[in-house]
From Swiss-Prot:
The keyword Ribonucleoprotein does not apply. This is Radiation response metalloprotease IrrE. The gene is irrE. Interacts with DdrOC. The active site is at E83. Composed of three structural domains: an N-terminal zinc-peptidase domain, a central helix-turn-helix motif, and a C-terminal GAF-type domain. Changing E83Q: Radiosensitive. Lack of protease activity. It comes from Deinococcus deserti (strain DSM 17065 / CIP 109153 / LMG 22923 / VCD115). Residues 262-281 are annotated as: Disordered. GO terms for biological process: proteolysis. PROSITE patterns: HTH_LACI_1 (PS00356), ZINC_PROTEASE (PS00142). Pfam families: Peptidase_M78. InterPro entries: G3DSA:1.10.10.1030, IrrE_HExxH, Rad_response_metalloprotease.
Length: 281
């Protein structure tokens, strides 16, 4: 018989502590550019080099952070913040002790990686910045676009951070055109699909990656016209079910950033829920 899984509060407490570490570290930085991010790590050097499929690594024995020089700048930036979070975590004996008490093996490694993502998000996207954008723009596609731009991170990274700070029941999504598989010559036609999705606390489902967005949906119309669009519409679940929502779609280059504000009382799934909890990428 295996031991019961640790209660969710253990991970929640660890995430809260990781955010505190990142916020404290970030408060002492002169800026958020690449070299300023390293300012608080005495004796640790930063090296960019080709790393194949790896984004980066932190080597505490040799006091060096390695970043893949062949990936996009915004990915390098998030990876750097992730590796800095590894250094911060290793410097907190109490947090390390708590983690080893609660987890072991592969699960311990998974939790550590999760915490370093939490730390990276808190470092690059401080709560004050997110709250300011939510105050100015509300929980909208525009807020998501502004967060990604001002924090200089990918829209996918931004949507998870924005969802965590959003109080009302809202689903966020990054959508882009993708070519559908087709056995005919020239391949299939392009279709707007969900690339990533996350929801605010209390919303037990989100949109699966690859979910198609109908051509007449506000998100598709916004991308087609290159104009922001906000109106009453629906969440287009892959199952075909449509949940009423106020849709705010903000087109940006070849993608559209979308928020789905759910009606009050619809944040909990019912017996005919459209998507499995956590079904996202």
């Amino acid at each position: 018989m295996t031991d019961p899984a640790p209660p969710p509060t253990a991970l929640a407490a660890a995430k809260a502590r990781m955010r505190e570490l990142a916020a404290s570290y970030g408060a002492g930085l002169p800026g958020r550019d690449t070299h300023s991010l390293m300012h608080g790590l005495d004796g640790i050097t930063l090296t960019f080099m080709p790393m194949g499929q790896r984004d980066g690594a932190y080597d505490p024995e040799h006091h060096v952070i390695l970043i893949n020089s062949q990936v996009r700048p915004e990915r390098q930036r998030f990876t750097l913040a992730h590796e800095i979070s590894h250094a911060l975590l290793l410097g907190d004996d109490d947090l390390l002790s708590d983690l080893h008490d609660e987890y072991e093996g592969d699960r311990l490694e998974q939790v550590i990686e999760t915490l370093c993502n939490v730390g990276a998000a808190a470092l690059l996207m401080p709560a004050e910045l997110i709250d300011d954008l939510l105050t100015r723009f509300g929980p909208t596609g525009r807020a998501l676009a502004e967060l990604a731009r001002r924090a200089d991170v990918s829209a996918t990274s931004a949507l998870y951070a924005l969802a965590e700070r959003t109080a009302p029941p809202v689903i966020y999504a990054v959508c882009a055109l993708s070519r559908q598989e087709d056995e005919g010559e020239g391949g299939g036609a392009k279709e707007l699909t969900v690339r990533a999705s996350s929801a605010s606390a209390g919303v037990k489902y989100s949109l699966s990656a690859g979910t198609p967005v109908p051509d007449d949906h506000p998100a598709a119309l916004a991308l087609d016209t290159r104009l922001p669009l906000a109106q009453d519409s629906y969440v287009p679940f892959r199952s075909g079910r449509r949940m009423p929502a106020y849709v705010d779609a903000f087109p940006e280059r070849q993608r559209v950033l979308v928020s789905f504000a759910l009606p009050a009382g619809r944040s909990e799934p019912d017996a005919d829920k459209p998507e499995a909890p956590g079904d996202q990428s």
